[in-house]
């Protein structure tokens, strides 16, 4: 089971390659032999989702099973499945982010890799910082969170 936590500042080179941090690379090697799926996020946030292959194989059939006559479901399928790229970390622990995904998330050199338990999000550093600045002021706490003690 995945337990991805923390935020990591990383860089992407001009060819679209990025080195996965050592700790994350070790977790991915143990969990899935370094085989991952990178895809577009369906939310309004412009970031990418990085799944270890076993987690993706649990999620993929659920997305495929959505009613394709429903416009919102079809859009979700096209966005997530249509942009999914199965890849394997190279010997140096790097991945090549496809140009279409770089464009979707406005990725440039400086990036943030953010752990969310079963997956990671990959953000441009600029978008991540803007999200953090805006989120505290814009969002109300969901009722489920009111009983949570941190």
UniProtKB/Swiss-Prot annotation:
SUPFAM superfamilies: AbrB/MazE/MraZ-like (SSF89447). It is found in: Cytoplasm, Nucleoid. HAMAP family: MraZ (MF_01008). InterPro entries: MraZ, MraZ_C, MraZ_dom, MraZ_N, MraZ_sf, SpoVT-AbrB_dom, SpoVT-AbrB_sf. Forms oligomers. Pfam families: MraZ. GO terms for cellular component: cytoplasm; nucleoid. CDD domains: MraZ_C (cd16321), MraZ_N (cd16320). Belongs to the MraZ family. Residues 7-55, 84-127 form the SpoVT-AbrB domain. The keyword Phosphoprotein does not apply. This is Transcriptional regulator MraZ. The gene is mraZ. GO terms for biological process: negative regulation of DNA-templated transcription initiation. GO terms for molecular function: DNA-binding transcription factor activity; transcription cis-regulatory region binding. Keywords: Cytoplasm, DNA-binding, Repeat, Transcription, Transcription regulation. Its main location: cytoplasm.
